[in-house]
Structure formats: C-alpha cells, structure tokens
Amino acid sequence: MARITVEDCLEVVNNRFELVMMASKRARQLANGVPPLIENNSEDKPTVLALREIAARKINSKMIDEIEKAERERTEREAMEWAAAEVVADEDISKSDD
C-alpha cells in the first residue's frame, strides 16, 4: 500500500493540530485493542493505521470521542465490579474469622 502522508490526511482534517490529536487518540485506541475500521494487511503500527483511517474518511473526531467515552465507561464499570467483588471477599474473610 502507498505511503500515507500528512497531506493525505489534511484533505480530511483542515487543522494540523487537530489531526495530531485525532491520530494520537485513535492510535492509542488501536494499541489498546479497539478493532480497526480498515483492513490492516501490511500489519501497520497503530499510528500509521490511525492515519490511514483518517485519510480514508473511516473515522472522525466525534467517533473517536465516542469510542473513548465507551472505553472509559467500560473501564470504570470493570473497576466497580472488581471493587464490589473485593468487598464481598473481605466480608467473607471477616465472617470466617468470627
């Protein structure tokens, strides 16, 4: 596949600074296991894959923010479930000590 350039992405995102923010957020999501929206036949690194998605108009800042919010909510929910399980385990240990 042809090399991706900043100019390719600037056709989609008008501001270089916004492009950097979008690409870095999306690359972080991809690195954390969020599935890509385009095929990754060449096993590109998350940063390159993020830029390819932006250039292909498969992702925008609103979508990135929604994915980020969903991931944050999932992480918080898992933390709450873990904390609740710890409380139950602590209560069980306290009861067995009596």
Curated annotation (Swiss-Prot):
Gene that this polypeptide is encoded by: rpoZ
EC category: transferase
Protein name per its UniProtKB record: DNA-directed RNA polymerase subunit omega
Oligomeric and partner information: The RNAP catalytic core consists of 2 alpha, 1 beta, 1 beta' and 1 omega subunit. When a sigma factor is associated with the core the holoenzyme is formed, which can initiate transcription.
GO cellular component term of the entry, any: DNA-directed RNA polymerase complex
GO molecular function: DNA binding; DNA-directed RNA polymerase activity
General function of this protein: Promotes RNA polymerase assembly. Latches the N- and C-terminal regions of the beta' subunit thereby facilitating its interaction with the beta and alpha subunits.
Family stated for the protein in its record: Belongs to the RNA polymerase subunit omega family.
Pfam families hit by this protein: RNA_pol_Rpb6
